[in-house]
């Protein structure tokens, strides 16, 4: 019996006790949670092979996409919805690795900017290429139509969850 069979058995037991119990909804929620966890674990393991975590990767890609590859800590924080404290911690790690450097802002001498170094540019380009192949391996298991449907359903659910929680 595989993991999902066990999960279904447990949820079906609840359904048998209460015929009104939302079996399908509970199963879908559990499948989403487990799929998300497994994907996060796989991505963490992949990025760990390059010596970074997902948060550091997101900071690097955000800087790479920025004009002149340079942003303030608050701009990064806002774009990624990370706390300023977390951005400081990640920046310390990336600076120690040689991927970013802190610079004085030209607009405000009191402010700092975080800029990708040439080593950071090379690293993120190499990592992005490897990640592209990895993502194709993961998502290539689904057909193009299944991928599109998955995207539509997830966007719809995310929008609904935003409405429900506000």
Residue positions per predicted region:
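Short, hydrophobic-biased segments on the C-terminal half of alpha helices
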Residues: 73, 91-92
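Charged, amphipathic alpha-helical coiled-coil/dimerization segments
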Residues: 92-149
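Active-site phosphate/pyrophosphate-handling residues
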Residues: 27, 58, 148
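C-terminal regulatory/oligomerization modules of transcriptional regulators
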Residues: 1-20, 145-166
